[in-house]
UniProtKB/Swiss-Prot annotation:
Family annotation (InterPro entries): CTT_SPB4, DEAD/DEAH_box_helicase_dom, Helicase_ATP-bd, Helicase_C-like, P-loop_NTPase, RNA-helicase_DEAD-box_CS, RNA_helicase_DEAD_Q_motif, SPB4-like_CTE
Domain observations: The Q motif is unique to and characteristic of the DEAD box family of RNA helicases and controls ATP binding and hydrolysis.
Family indicated by similarity: Belongs to the DEAD box helicase family. DDX55/SPB4 subfamily.
Domain Helicase ATP-binding: 45-249
Role: ATP-binding RNA helicase involved in the biogenesis of 60S ribosomal subunits. Binds 90S pre-ribosomal particles and dissociates from pre-60S ribosomal particles after processing of 27SB pre-rRNA. Required for the normal formation of 18S rRNA through the processing of pre-rRNAs at sites A0, A1 and A2, and the normal formation of 25S and 5.8S rRNAs through the processing of pre-rRNAs at sites C1 and C2.
Assigned keywords, A-Z: ATP-binding, Coiled coil, Helicase, Hydrolase, Nucleotide-binding, Nucleus, Ribosome biogenesis, RNA-binding, rRNA processing
GO biological process: assembly of large subunit precursor of preribosome; maturation of LSU-rRNA
EC number: 3.6.4.13
Protein name: ATP-dependent rRNA helicase spb4
Residue ranges, compositional bias (Acidic residues): 628-639
Coiled-coil features, chain-numbered ranges: 521-624
Biased composition (Basic and acidic residues): 575-622
Amino acid sequence: MAPKPPAGTSSRAWEAVSPSLSEWVLDAVASWGFSKMTPVQASAIPLFMAHKDVVVEAVTGSGKTLSFLVPVVEKLLRLEEPIKKHHIGAIIISPTRELASQIHQVLLSLLAFHPPSAAAIKPPGEDDAPREKFSASTLKVVPQLLLGGSTTPAEDLSYFLKHSPNVLISTPGRLLELLSSPHVHCPQSSFEMLVLDEADRLLDLGFKETLQNILRRLPKQRRTGLFSASISEAVDQIVRVGLRNPVKVLVKVKGTSGVQDKRTPASLQMTYLTTPPAHKFLTLRPILTSLQPTPQKTIFFVSTCSGVDYLAAILPLLLGDDFQLIPLHGKHPANVRQKNFNRFINAHTPSILLTTDVASRGLDIPSVDLVVQIDPPSDPKTFIHRCGRAGRAGRRGVSVVLLHPGREEDYVSFLEVRKTPVTPFPHPISISDSDASTATEAARKIIKQDRALHDRGQKAFVSWLRSYSKHQASSIFRVADLDWEALGHAWGLLKLPKMPELRNFTGDRTLGVDLDWENYAYKDKQREKRRKEVLQESAEAGAQQTSNKRRASESVAWSNKVDQKNKKQKRREQKHLQQEKRRWEKMTEEEKQKARETQKMLEEIRQKNEEARALRRAEKAAGKAADNDGDDDEFEGFD
């Protein structure tokens, strides 16, 4: 155990934690250059180690990962005896594969300083150095990472049975599959701690039911920690169900003005830039080049996966060769996501990650200098998470959100109310209309070479609009205010797509582009061959349909229409009888008797009404006869 801290030690010193941290943990954080704890670590670690349930809300980039990893490791290594084989001591649940992988890597780095755990984790033959052997009774932490898409559930179970890990780090779905196996045990005698990282994100992604199923498989007597940059009402529901008298830790940031309720790091400069739709994508390079030194790692956020796919082909034309653009979104296969994520992390030249909100939460991407929100997020809560990819762990960072002139500028005041103030981007940027036109033509030149790019652009534009229309700040982001033609030119579209929002649009849907659409081809030969076949089939089917309609219209007699009308009436009557029959069958005897009495009463009323009508007709006829008897000149008709 680490020695007691000397008098006068800062309350944020690692040596000041009570109960004291192990010597090897102190060595680990010292080797990483963490001379003292962050505020969230200083608050959460002692509580979580002292057998308290915790709900931790702290700004992004504030060191939440170590706030739960250190207590988990310390707890498992202070047990009276090792956890039994195939029993689990702790579980850490993450919303995304990338975040789970990152937590796993941090844990491995930490356990490298604990020889028994390091020896258990390192596969034999990994290097030539002899492996130190420890007895079976030695306490150690052995983690397993569970990720959907990279391994099968059967492979996960096989690894679990072979290595008997006592800590699981996983996304919800794959974790539930493993816990459903009868070979995996989480009894109260073994299970100690559950951590939900980015808890509100877990619920936003629709994992609530899965989480509830997981909680039902875990003992109620456990320590639970919820960690997030924002705690939503949905998280409060999980708190009520899954935590016992939790301690809430809320860490705020004190800015230079003394305001203490900012929700983002003080080292992060959050700005906005107003730009017309036609100039939006053209402003990206000037933003990058106006900052000194030039950002080495930048993240561009857009609203949809389709947008990432399309802009990944278009933006390099505008950014030039100075920046490497790397796409990443949630619909990429798992291996592609991991490959592109690693490319960005390990890049040694100025690089840009073009992504969706899959990268907005939890990921500790080192040395991100700049975040540009090309599309403001639909959910305002996501805004601070996006910004927080820069300015992490005290590092200086800049974030920029792009807004259209007009009503969208009200977003600045909206963010101020939400305690996430933004200031104007400090470097003036000027784009001319001629520059915008040149960029549009350059994009269209590329798109005209392959119809697949046109299809991708149409899909991306429609999906962007759907996202825009669902913005929670709908009074600010109004579809009715959009300049369709300017947007079409900005995106480099060859025409505006067909969609309900353009039903009343009276402008130029072709965007001034003259193109031979019938001969506009795909680069992929198989796809182009199929397109031509479909065109031919459509032409033949259209001709046949026209011929059939003509023959049908010539041969249909008026009497057939009468027959059809009679048949329709007959079907309606039969349907009514069937409904009445089903209703009668569902009645009780009492209800049937009451229905009979009601029917009898109605029949009596109808009969009386009919008798009254017959009497009135008779009286009327008698009156007319009397009048006729007194009229000698009454016309009797022709013979």
